[in-house]
Amino acid sequence: MTFLLNIMLMSSTSQNVAMPYAELPGQCIQLTGDLVEVVYYYPNGSIKQIGFLENGNKTGEWVSYNLEGQIVVKAYFENNLKEGKWKVYNDEGELQYKIQYRNGKKVWAQEYDESGNTTAFNYK
């Protein structure tokens, strides 16, 4: 998933922002220095995604939710590059994939069935 956000924060208060890629409302809260927490919402008001920007780049954990509030992706970024272990869940909250990234490139991926058994493993 690629999410774009061009925001310049002038104060340490929270503010509402428009998300141009999806026209969904969002909120930015400056935490410390250049670290900003970003929260995106579905039109019904439920949280769609939470993550962090540092100097305008994605950093740390980003969590995406479905309309029912179930986690569908736990992702990690470092300086706007995919990094570390990502987990992808189905709408029932069951783990479907684990994907390992290093410097923005996929290192390996593991797929799971409904019972949690590994069904595929891909190493690059």
Indicate residue ranges for each PLM-predicted region.
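Glycine/tyrosine- and acidic-biased, solvent-exposed loop/turn segments at the edges of beta-strands
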Residues: 3-124
